[in-house]
Amino acid sequence: MTTIAVVGATGQVGQVMRTLLEERNFPADTVRFFASPRSAGRKIEFRGTEIEVEDITQATEESLKGIDVALFSAGGTASKQYAPLFAAAGATVVDNSSAWRKDDEVPLIVSEVNPSDKDSLVKGIIANPNCTTMAAMPVLKPLHDAAGLVKLHVSSYQAVSGSGLAGVETLAKQVAAVGDHNVEFVHDGQAADAGDVGPYVSPIAYNVLPFAGNLVDDGTFETDEEQKLRNESRKILGLPDLKVSGTCVRVPVFTGHTLTIHAEFDKAITVEQAQEILGAASGVELVDVPTPLAAAGIDESLVGRIRQDSTVDDNRGLVLVVSGDNLRKGAALNTIQIAELLVK
C-alpha cells in the first residue's frame, strides 16, 4: 500500500504533477493533496474521485504518518518549513524548489543521469534541479561518458512560465495591450505601451530580456539562474571542477526553455559520434531544429543543430541546441520519475 502526497497541488507545476500521476498510472493506493490556506478545502477530481485539498499550515507529524512519498512544488520557503516535517513523519520528500539543491546531504537527481543517488538519503529529502539545468543533463551526461566534459558555455532562452503564473499572465496581458500596434515596433520600440512589466525588468512582449532570475549580491553580476546552471551541473554530473559560464535570457514564449551549448571535452568527439550517442540516449530525442513549441507537452529533451566547435582544437568541442518543456520534464515529470524509482 503506497500513499503519495502532492504539496502545492493547485499551483502551475502541481497541476502538471496531478496530470502526470494519472497519465503514468502511478502505483499509489492513496493520494493526498496539500496547498496554502487559500486553496484548502477545494475539491480536485483525480482518477474519477474527488479529493479535498488539505491546509499545509495545519499539518503535523502525526497527521502525516503513512505518507510514503511527498512531491513538493510549493516554493522554497514552504519547502524549508514543511519538507523536514514530512520527512520526520516517514515520507521521502522530492522537492522541486531551490531550497535544498546546494545541501551536501541532499542528492540532486535527474532520473536518467544519476538515479542511484537516491540511495544516499541523510535528511529524507531529494532535490529536483532547476528547469534549465534539467533540459541539458540527459544530453550532456552520455556525451561526458564518451569524451569527458571539461567546459561549458551556455546561453539559455527561457519561457515566461518559468516565472510562474505571473510571467504567463504578464506576457498575455502585454500582447493584448499592444494589440494591432505591434507592427509599429518595426521602427520604434516605444511606439506602444505594453503596460505593467510584471516580474520583469522591462516589457517581455515583443522583446528579449538578457536577465532571467534575480541578481546575486556577491560581486559576480550573475543572476541566480546563471549560478544554478553552474552549481547544479557540477553536482549532478559529479564534476566539482567543471568550468561553466552562462547567460540566461527571458524570451516571450509561454512554455519551453531552449539552450545553445558550447561543450569542450577531454577527448575528440565528432558530430557523427555525438548523433549516434544521443540517438540512443534515454530522455533525449534527436531532431534537426529544436524549438520550444515542439518541446512543449513532451517528455524528452530535444537536441539538434549539432556542429563541431571550430574554436576548440582536435575535434574536442561541440555546439548544440537543446529545447525542453520547463513545466513537464523541467519540473513535474522528473519529480514523478524520482518517485517511481523510490516505489519500485
Swiss-Prot record:
GO terms for molecular function: aspartate-semialdehyde dehydrogenase activity; NAD binding; NADP binding; protein dimerization activity. Its EC number is 1.2.1.11. One of its GO terms (biological process) is diaminopimelate biosynthetic process. Phosphate binds at R101, K228. Substrate binds at Q158, R250. Gene3D superfamilies: Dihydrodipicolinate Reductase, domain 2, NAD(P)-binding Rossmann-like Domain. It catalyses: L-aspartate 4-semialdehyde + phosphate + NADP(+) = 4-phospho-L-aspartate + NADPH + H(+). This is Aspartate-semialdehyde dehydrogenase. The lineage of its organism: Bacteria, Bacillati, Actinomycetota, Actinomycetes, Mycobacteriales. Homodimer.
